[in-house]
């Protein structure tokens, strides 16, 4: 990056791809604002149906510590635009502007065909996986666009292979990830002449807690069963996604 002291914001930063991305950015010299759910919000955690256990404040502190002195934990829910705006304001007030945003917050729920999917599953998958990306993009992009020319900000959303093909019994999750791909395509067109870019990564089966939840939803013994279905013959390591 052109700036001497670049700044990155990562959502879903407590575990998995988000934590790996934060650590990678810190190793490259970025000051990293790690955003994930607060420890003191068990009610919000229990709203997500199914076996997935979202990360919380303790995980977030550990992920920030893994970034050395460059990681700073910020407790916020990506479903809450006001909370995200407050974090972004804090980051800008301390560091001036934002260079990179990684929207990695996500969750998986389902395990039933579409016609048996209840409203809570649908709403939670759209709110977390799609609206969460919209919320952090809307909160952070004005700062990136206000940077003096030549701008070179980067917005990266973590979508899924489900953005390219539907996953049975995960209609809501698949719809949300297709939505992320569409959102980023539109955003990329809007940013075309700004110097700021927007991209999405669409990983397949990655060794994270979300894959454990997916295995449970499909009645698999553990996530290793997905390795047999992977084209590369194994699960993807989160750090491999963070390195892209």
Q: Predicted regions span which residues?
A:
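Short-chain dehydrogenase/reductase
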Residues: 2-95, 109-110, 120-121, 213
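Substrate-binding pocket helix/loop in short-chain dehydrogenase/reductase
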Residues: 112-114, 121-126, 226
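Active-site helix of classical SDR
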Residues: 137, 176, 184
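Alpha-helical segment proximal to the catalytic Tyr-Lys
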Residues: 142, 189-193
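Residue(s) in the substrate-gating loop at a strand-loop-helix junction
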Residues: 160
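C-terminal helical subdomain
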Residues: 200, 220-244
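Short, flexible catalytic-loop segment of classical short-chain dehydrogenase/reductase
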Residues: 203-213, 238
């Amino acid at each position: 990056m052109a700036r001497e002291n670049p700044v990155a914001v990562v959502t879903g930063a407590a575990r998995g791809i988000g934590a790996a991305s934060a650590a990678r950015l810190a190793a490259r010299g970025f000051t990293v604002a790690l955003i994930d759910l607060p420890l003191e919000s068990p009610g919000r955690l229990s709203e997500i149906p199914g076996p997935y256990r979202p990360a919380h404040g303790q995980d977030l502190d550990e992920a920030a510590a893994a970034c050395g002195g460059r990681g700073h934990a910020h407790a916020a829910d990506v479903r809450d635009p006001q909370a995200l705006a407050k974090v972004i304001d804090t980051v800008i007030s301390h560091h001036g502007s934002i260079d990179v945003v990684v929207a990695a917050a996500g969750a998986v729920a389902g395990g039933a065909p579409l016609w048996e999917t209840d409203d809570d599953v649908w709403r939670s998958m759209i709110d977390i996986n799609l609206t969460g990306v919209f919320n952090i993009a809307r909160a952070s992009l004005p700062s990136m666009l206000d940077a003096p020319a030549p701008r070179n900000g980067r917005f990266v959303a973590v979508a899924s292979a489900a953005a390219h093909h539907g996953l049975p019994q995960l209609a809501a999750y698949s719809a949300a990830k297709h939505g992320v791909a569409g959102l980023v395509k539109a955003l990329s067109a809007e940013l075309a002449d700004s110097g700021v870019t927007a991209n999405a990564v669409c990983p397949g089966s990655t060794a994270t807690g979300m894959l454990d939840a997916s295995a449970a939803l499909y009645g698999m013994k553990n996530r290793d069963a997905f390795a047999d279905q992977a084209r590369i013959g194994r699960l993807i390591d989160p750090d491999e996604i963070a390195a892209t």
